[in-house]
């Protein structure tokens, strides 16, 4: 099933599918407006659903950066497109940040 997510006014398709490369769990293609997430637990991860939620957050952050005009404005843009450390940090910390924002009515 293909879902869509609105990223700063642009609709991105979220596609869950098996990947040929077992080392890739997801990708964001801002040129086709597609986010692809692995749907097969080929690596036999313990909590696969949690890993894929984290991966989806990670790819959505890439989409937000791209739609903000930051497709290639980071140190490693030739290899990755965005600084993966920054994207990982937001992906990991965002659930905690949203709770903090909600606790003080900051949304």
Model-assigned labels for residue ranges:
Residues 54-66:
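Active-site recognition of the HExxH zinc-binding catalytic motif
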């Amino acid at each position: 099933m293909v879902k869509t997510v609105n990223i700063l006014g642009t609709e991105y398709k979220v596609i869950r599918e098996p990947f040929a490369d077992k080392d890739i769990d997801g990708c964001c293609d801002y040129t086709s407006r597609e986010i692809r997430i692995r749907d097969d637990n080929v690596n036999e991860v313990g909590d696969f659903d949690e890993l894929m939620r984290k991966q989806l957050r990670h790819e959505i952050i890439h989409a937000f950066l791209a739609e903000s005009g930051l497709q290639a404005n980071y140190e490693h843009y030739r290899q990755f497109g965005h600084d993966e450390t920054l994207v990982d940090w937001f992906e990991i910390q965002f659930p905690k940040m949203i709770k903090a924002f909600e606790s003080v009515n900051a949304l």
